[in-house]
From Swiss-Prot:
Entry coiled-coil feature ranges: 61-139
Listed name of the protein: Tail needle protein gp26
Subcellular location: Virion
Primary gene name: 26
Cleaved signal peptide residues: none
Native source species: Enterobacteria phage HK620
Inverted coiled coil: annotated span: 175-233
SUPFAM superfamilies in alphabetical order: Tropomyosin (SSF57997)
Keyword terms: Calcium, Coiled coil, Late protein, Metal-binding, Pore-mediated penetration of viral genome into host cell, Repeat, Viral genome ejection through host cell envelope, Viral penetration into host cytoplasm, Viral short tail ejection system, Viral tail protein, Virion, Virus entry into host cell
Purpose of the protein: Cell-perforating component and plug protein of the phage tail machine. Together with gp4 and gp10, gp26 is required for stabilization of the condensed DNA within the capsid by plugging the hole through which the DNA enters. Host cell membrane perforation allows viral DNA ejection. The needle penetrates the host outer membrane. The needle is released and the internal head protein gp7 is ejected to form an extra-cellular channel.
Binding site for Ca(2+): 63, 66
Length: 233
């Protein structure tokens, strides 16, 4: 704080010093001039002292102002230092989070690569399924379609064939002994009647024999057909 005493001027009580106030006929002329010069010097010294005091006071005032400004600067520097420290903490935290995020991103990239590889496999499997579905659509036997359907391959069933719930073809019947002879595949009159008198004639017996032979041959033809279809053996 500035010293206010420095701002108070030095007051010289004896402001006038000349030969009129000195004793006469005592001092030599040179001494009188010396004394008068001393008075002038004292005034000059007082003026310089006052100027120096004023300068010192002004300097102290300026120093006080600078001290206030420096204190403000110190406060601002302290605040800035605190803010910088907070920013450094936040920056360190952010750097840590960035490291974590980079790790998470790397993990997610690996997951995406795995998913993409899995998608390629799924696409391949889907292509296979679509191809199979296309094949099934173009070549299948429906349970509900009423139009005629056909198979290019043999059909094997476990027990029997049925039509409207009624069995029409069953399992093969075994134990049949194959007949011999010539089967009758041509036409014959199933309503053929035979005339037989009270006494058998040769022609009547021959006609009956022929009819019996035709019947046996037709039976053989039917047996052969059943064998060829695998119904008997």
């Amino acid at each position: 704080m500035a010293d206010s005493n420095l701002n108070e001027p030095v007051i010289i009580q004896a402001t006038r010093l000349d030969t009129s106030i000195l004793p006469r006929n005592i001092f030599s002329q040179s001494y009188l001039l010396y004394v008068i010069a001393q008075g002038t010097d004292v005034g000059n010294v007082a003026n310089k002292a006052n100027e120096a005091g004023q300068g010192a006071y002004d300097a102290q005032v300026k120093n006080d102002e600078q001290d206030v400004e420096l204190a403000d600067h110190d406060a601002r520097i302290a605040a800035n230092t605190k803010a910088i420290n907070i920013l450094e903490v936040r920056l360190t935290t952010a750097e840590g989070k960035i490291v974590v995020l980079r790790s998470d991103v790397d993990y997610l990239l690996d997951e995406v690569i795995d998913i993409q590889a899995h998608l390629v496999t799924v696409d391949q499997r889907l292509d296979g399924v679509e191809s199979d579905v296309s094949d099934i659509k173009s070549d299948y036997v429906s349970k509900t379609v009423t139009e005629s359907q056909s198979l290019a391959s043999p059909l094997d069933v476990k027990t029997s064939y049925s039509v409207d719930g009624i069995q029409v073809v069953g399992a093969r019947q075994t134990g049949w002994t194959a007949a011999t002879g010539t089967p009758l595949l041509g036409s014959f009159n199933a309503n053929q009647s035979y005339t037989v008198g009270t006494t058998y004639t040769q022609s009547e017996v021959a006609a009956l024999a022929t009819g019996l032979e035709q019947a046996r041959q037709r039976i053989l033809a039917l047996e052969t057909a059943l064998r060829l279809h695998g119904l008997i053996d």
